[in-house]
Design a protein with these regions (language model features):
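Conserved Class I S-adenosyl-L-methionine
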Residues: 160-233
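A short SAM/SAH-binding and catalytic strip from SAM-dependent methyltransferases
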Residues: 93-106
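Short alpha-helix
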Residues: 138-153, 157-159
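Conserved class I S-adenosyl-L-methionine
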Residues: 31-40
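Class I SAM-dependent methyltransferase Rossmann-like catalytic core
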Residues: 1-16
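Conserved beta-strand signature within the Rossmann-like core of class I S-adenosyl-L-methionine
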Residues: 115-128
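Conserved alpha-helix/loop element of class I SAM-dependent methyltransferases that forms part
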Residues: 14-31
């Protein structure tokens, strides 16, 4: 699937996943078994491995898990299926939810499956970046997460940071396909000239075009002990 190819190209030339892992690493217990929930193609799982004993990467997308399995390293296990149905035999020491799931759902899953800290990585902006018009991200934002945690009285720490995760392209046609794939606007599309105006010179002969994207993110850290048992229902 082309979306996976785009993602792997972006991961290969940016330190995005390494940057996220470096923010989480100091807060991980020693020799931890970490779950990367909604791992996608597993780039963050691989980036987390140097900082822990084992990473279990879970995603419901069979193609994403197949892609990860083709690039597995020692100490990373890939599992395909629904997060709630794939509970570990022993609770995880930590769980990471990177741009995955509604906050209420992650709290419920974590209370059942984790005995330590959970890390929620959320977008620190409100609108979709690759759409023609203004398309809201709704509840999948840092602001929404803060509202939920405050409402439930769950203590947390939060760290704001940025990580470059631009998209390289092999051709202008690839850039056009990218915007067609990720445009969430129901009525508007970007013209070829508008797409070209967003691009800069690429990093190499293989990728002559580049779409810059400095991603503003928030890292929420929560102790599962602070999540009430009612959240697990």
């Amino acid at each position: 699937e082309e979306s996976i190819a785009f993602l792997r190209d972006a991961a290969a030339i940016n330190r995005y996943y390494e940057t996220v892992a470096e923010r989480i690493a100091p807060q991980l217990p020693e020799n931890a078994h970490v779950c990367d929930a909604g791992c996608g193609v597993g780039e963050l799982s691989l980036a987390l491995k140097p900082y822990c004993h084992h990473v279990t990467a879970v995603d419901a997308d069979a193609l994403a898990i197949k892609t990860l399995k083709a690039h597995l390293i020692e100490g990373v296990t890939a599992r395909c299926g629904d997060m709630e149905a794939l509970a570990p035999e022993k609770p995880y020491d930590a769980m990471v939810f990177c741009l995955f799931g509604r906050t209420q759902d992650t709290l419920r899953i974590a209370k059942k499956q984790c005995r330590g800290r959970i890390f929620l990585v959320k977008r620190d902006y409100s609108h979709h970046r690759f759409s023609a018009g203004k398309v809201s991200l709704g509840e999948y934002t840092a602001g929404s997460t803060e509202n939920v945690l405050r409402e439930k009285g769950i203590p947390y720490t939060v760290e704001h940071f940025t990580a470059e995760f631009g998209q390289p392209f092999r051709s202008l046609e690839a850039a056009e396909r990218f915007f067609a794939l990720y445009n969430r606007s129901e009525s508007e599309v970007l013209s070829k000239d508008e797409i070209r105006a967003r691009l800069t010179a690429g990093p190499s002969a293989e990728f002559p075009y580049y779409l810059p994207h400095k991603k503003a993110l928030c890292l929420f850290t929560i102790e599962t002990a602070a999540i009430s048992k009612e959240e697990a229902v």
